[in-house]
């Protein structure tokens, strides 16, 4: 399994917190505090801050961490529309190219379904990332892979979507996508991925409205 790079993982965690409203406009983000909270060194947090600043989500302060910038619904919609465009294309390409590891991933997902109530957050997130990056890899386009990696923001779990409910829906959607890829049905793989990301976007937007 491909491990989630620390910078990408932390960027995804912070991006999800920004989108859900855990961090609001004007809030100060302490590099040291976040590193301690996540149990990592300051280096990957600093790299995550730089990535978030490049996206216009935060403003870096010299030796003082960062300040959260205003985020509106259009920013979130634009972000997810890009994921829909690129990730649905990746799924279609994976179906055309073939994805040998699809069977193994489907087995892992079916196993996860059997023990859904005891599935840990980290286990779910690792499997979620493994499915998506497996599809990106099978698409066989390094530029596309890097763009999707930069857009990655992890699972869209929030108080409007209970964790178990999200796990159940997302896991079945992953199985559906991989089954289409396995059958080399590029058109359906594209559609299944579009619907998968659209549901994530809808959940994040619901969280945003209830902030």
What do these predicted regions represent?
Residues 1-96, 208-211:
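Short linear motifs at protein or domain termini
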Residues 1-3, 187-211:
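C-terminal effector-binding regulatory domain of bacterial HTH transcription factors
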Residues 5, 165-168:
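Short helix-capping and inter-helix turn/linker motifs at the boundaries of alpha-helical repeat units
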Residues 17, 21, 151-158, 203, ...:
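A short secondary-structure junction motif
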Residues 20, 55, 118-119, 183:
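Charged, alpha-helical scaffolding/interaction elements associated with membrane systems
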Residues 27, 59-60, 128, 169-171:
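Short, flexible turn/loop "capping" segments at secondary-structure junctions
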Residues 96, 182-183:
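Alpha-helix C-terminal capping/termination sites
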Residues 100-162, 171-179, 188-198:
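Conserved amphipathic alpha-helical segments that form helical-bundle/coiled-coil interaction surfaces
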């Amino acid at each position: 399994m491909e491990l989630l790079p620390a910078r990408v993982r932390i960027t995804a965690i912070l991006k999800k917190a920004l989108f859900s409203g855990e961090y609001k406009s004007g809030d100060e983000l302490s590099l040291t505090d976040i590193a301690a909270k996540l149990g990592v060194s300051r280096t990957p947090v600093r790299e995550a801050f730089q990535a978030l600043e490049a996206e216009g989500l935060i403003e870096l302060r010299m030796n003082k961490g960062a300040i959260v910038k205003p985020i509106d619904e259009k920013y979130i919609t634009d972000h997810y529309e890009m994921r829909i465009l690129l990730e649905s294309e990746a799924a279609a390409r994976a179906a055309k190219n073939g994805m040998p590891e699809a069977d193994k991933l489907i087995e892992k997902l079916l196993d996860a379904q059997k023990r859904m109530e005891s599935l840990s957050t980290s286990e779910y997130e690792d499997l979620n990332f493994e499915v998506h990056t497996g599809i990106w890899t099978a698409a066989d386009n390094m530029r596309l892979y890097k763009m999707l990696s930069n857009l990655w923001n992890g699972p869209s779990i929030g108080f409007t979507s209970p964790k178990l409910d999200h796990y159940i829906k997302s896991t079945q959607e992953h199985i559906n996508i991989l089954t289409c890829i396995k059958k080399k049905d590029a058109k359906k793989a594209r559609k299944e991925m579009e619907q998968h990301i659209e549901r994530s976007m809808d959940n994040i937007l619901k969280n945003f409205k209830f902030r």
